[in-house]
Design a protein with these regions (language model features):
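Helical (often loop-to-helix) elements that flank the catalytic cores of nucleotide-handling enzymes
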Residues: 245-287
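Long, contiguous juxta-domain segments that are non-catalytic but functionally important
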Residues: 70-117, 122-159
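Low-complexity, serine/threonine/proline-enriched polar segments
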Residues: 141-182, 286-288
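A short, contiguous, amphipathic alpha-helix enriched in charged residues
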Residues: 191-223
Length: 469
């Protein structure tokens, strides 16, 4: 395995400093040991569980010295529960990616800010009544109040009314009023096919936009391109919905303003119509061959930039949109109480320590993915994600900068920082290309920090405090 930058990553720490350091357990460590661990943490961005590589970095052909050992590489996990540090880095990149497509920067011209742009939310339909926090302005409304004298009991005899004004932290939010009435099969199938539904939405959107603008589809393709970035988010009921920034550009590789007939108001209306048109018949379990899926009626589209006519709502704040999408690009990748890895057996589902509602969704995905069912066998692969197996942040090719470009820029910046005092070899001496042979030969050695030494514990505590700030 070849790893760039490995030579600098295992450079030995100079043996000098103010003296020994005492840990919380009164264990004395040397300043050099603490600084060595601190440098390791800095190189991995204080990663919680880095990848450990063992091998050789370089060879001094004159002296025979070999630079090698254990190299720690950041895990790069974007899940907030798996690694707060790598997740925070991913969140920052996501924010820059979204913001660049709204205001310019990172190679995108600032003129993109004048383009028609909309923040859209596509939700799932109802699969049964659930507890919800309902608002009117800033007032919290009763969840499901009884408004007439009809019987508010379901076919199973359960009361499906709820007069409670739920708070944000109420654990009942998203839970069905009656678990036996709730359509768990359809809910899991919606999650599984959510990516396909969004793809169909992007197919229907240009058609409806052309009709509303009074042009043919061919003329629309000649006039503009639709760029977007979207993030998937779990609702409290465990169902995926999408938030998307959708922008109109003229054709070509640049970021040119499209013709003035295509406004944000027209785009808002087209988004609503396209979402209503999406339909997908998915195979289900025995005795129920097909389930018709589509987006719910609560599709929302709001302009981000002011246009001559605004279809609905008020223009949204750019920072709020960028921060919102970046937040859920990392947070939504986790389902509370469920493992981050695949479930291997039905017995593992029984042992899950999560809300009963989520456990029933996992069980439904497992059952639909069984060889006896008519569903897709990949449902078992994504049972721990309640059926959803797609990416949580995706974008069209030319919306803005890419994650890879941001990472390359950051790596180059760090390389230049390290070279500020002159290029040095792995032994801390001025680099002599004629005698230092760079090898960079590494093999996988494990996960996590190599040894829980006092220096490691103290450095990790420092990293935790830094993340807290």
């Amino acid at each position: 395995m070849s790893t760039s930058g490995a030579a600098a990553a295992i450079a030995p720490e100079p043996q000098h400093g103010p003296g020994p350091v005492a840990t919380a357990d009164d264990e004395v460590i040397t300043w050099a040991e603490f600084r060595a661990w601190e440098r390791q943490l800095a190189r991995t961005g204080a990663c919680s569980r880095p990848i450990r590589l063992r091998g050789t970095s370089a060879i001094n052909t004159a002296s025979g010295e070999v630079a090698g050992g254990v190299l720690h590489v950041a895990c790069g996990n974007r899940r907030e529960t798996a690694c707060p540090s790598c997740s925070a880095l991913y969140k920052g990149d996501a924010r820059q990616l979204v913001r660049a497509g709204l205001t310019g920067g990172k190679g995108v011209p600032e003129s993109v800010a004048t383009h028609p742009c909309v923040f859209a939310t596509l939700t799932a339909p109802s699969f049964g009544p659930v507890h919800a926090r309902r608002m009117r302005g800033k007032t919290v409304l009763p969840c499901r109040p009884r408004r007439d004298s009809k019987d508010w009991r379901c076919p199973h005899g359960r009361d499906i009314s709820c007069p409670v004004r739920h708070v944000d932290e109420d654990p009942r939010l998203g839970r069905p009023m009656c678990g036996d009435c709730y359509d768990y099969e359809a809910a899991v199938l919606f999650n599984f096919h959510a990516g396909t539904l969004f793809k169909r939405f992007t197919t229907y959107l240009p058609r409806h936009l052309a009709r509303l603008a009074g042009v043919t589809r061919k003329k629309l393709r000649a006039d503009l391109r639709i760029r977007y970035v979207k993030v998937a988010e779990y609702q409290a009921r465990g169902i995926i919905h999408f938030h998307a920034v959708i922008r109109l550009d003229a054709p070509g590789t640049g970021y040119t303003l499209p013709p003035p007939r295509y406004t944000a108001a027209t785009l808002c209306d087209a988004i609503t119509l396209a979402a209503r048109a999406v339909r997908l018949d998915a195979p289900a379990g025995p005795g129920r061959p097909r389930v018709r899926l589509g987006f719910g009626p609560q599709t929302k589209a709001d302009p981000i930039w002011r246009q001559p006519v605004i279809a609905s709502g008020q223009p949204l704040d750019i920072d709020a949109v960028a921060n919102y999408i970046a937040k859920y690009a990392t947070k939504s990748a986790d389902v509370p109480g469920l493992p981050g890895t695949r479930i291997r057996s039905a017995a593992a589902i029984v042992a899950l320590r999560c809300p009963a509602h989520h456990k029933r969704m996992v069980a439904a995905a497992w059952q639909l993915g069984s060889p006896q069912a008519t569903g897709d066998p990949r449902l078992r692969q994504w049972a721990h994600m309640l059926g959803y197996g797609g990416h949580f942040l995706t974008k069209s090719r030319r919306y803005s900068v890419t994650f890879a470009q941001l990472r390359r820029t950051r790596a180059e910046h760090r390389r230049l920082e390290r070279q500020g005092d002159g290029v040095r070899d792995p032994w801390g001496r001025p680099l002599d290309d004629t005698i230092v042979l760079v090898v960079n030969d590494w093999t996988y050695a494990g996960r996590g920090y190599a040894a829980p030494t006092p220096g490691a514990q103290l450095a990790l505590a420092s990293a935790d405090r830094a993340r807290g700030r």
